[in-house]
Amino acid sequence: MPRSPAGPHAVTAPASRPSKDTLRYPRRGGSRTEWLTENDVATAYRARFTAAAEREQRLAAIEEDLVDALAARTTPHLIVTVVPEQPGDMVIDSARFDRYQQELLGAQLYLGQPGGAFGRVSVGPRRLIVTEGAGRYSARAELHRDGSATIALSLSGRIHVDDYEEAQLHTAEPGDVVYPLLCALPFLAAHARDRAAASGLAQASVTLVADMAAHPSQTRVLDPDRPDIVPFRVDRIDPGTGRPRPLTPESYPHATAAAGVLLDNLADQGRGLLQAAAALADELLQAYGYPESGLITRAGELNPAGFSQRTCGTVAQWAEQHGLLEPL
């Protein structure tokens, strides 16, 4: 039985007393197999749950670092984070940094579009920092040595203004939320797998904020000169009028979703990526009145035509290249 963060694992083994086979917990001790006592099993389960809590803390910490770096931004962003269950180890030195830099400057971030989205790669504390540019709408990713990674992507949408040209409401279509999620997951998973040599399961989360000040980590920051947070909704567009068609009058400044994922499934950009994206997108969009996204099913079936006008063609092209338009 290989090691995993889900241990201890029970196996069918001969009973120590005259009876049928029972479930027992093995442990490798040198070249021999040892059987765990009840105390050993209890300790192992405690270690499992402690490790899960530490991953949650790790996820929150690296996301907070990213939000702190972008704290001045006042427009809607999607923040996606992936933390492997078994940490990897990306070595950072001069020779390897040159290689990482070349890889990342040519990497494809936006699915269905040519590579080369990023313009700058730099070194931070135990991480690589990758940015599109210096603008307030540019993407920023932080790729950590242990394989954990997070990225913030500005959301495309509409800005509704009053007579004085002051923003009163930001809206985005479901496709403008799901597409950047679909792009971020394989990019982050590829870092964990290919640079840090992490593998297996990971914890993935997605956070949608109307304004970086709406992120939970920023609630303790008081800035009297900062403008108020502009309300945000996810609205479909009425094809007849071209105007937003809200499902709910409520606006939420902050929404989150989380799921367990397989790194290989995400990095390989196959059906597993669609299934993971569907689980996250459905949970995220429920905050805005949608039972499910309607764009990707939990089985991994994709509906490119349901995406927004600016993303549907790109999604269809990418899906065709990867054989994901075939019915299941």
Which residues make up each language-model segment?
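Divalent-cation
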Residues: M1-P18
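Bergerat-fold GHKL/Histidine-kinase-like ATPase
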Residues: G30-L328
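Segments surrounding the PLD/"HKD" phosphodiesterase catalytic module and close analogs
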Residues: P14-E34
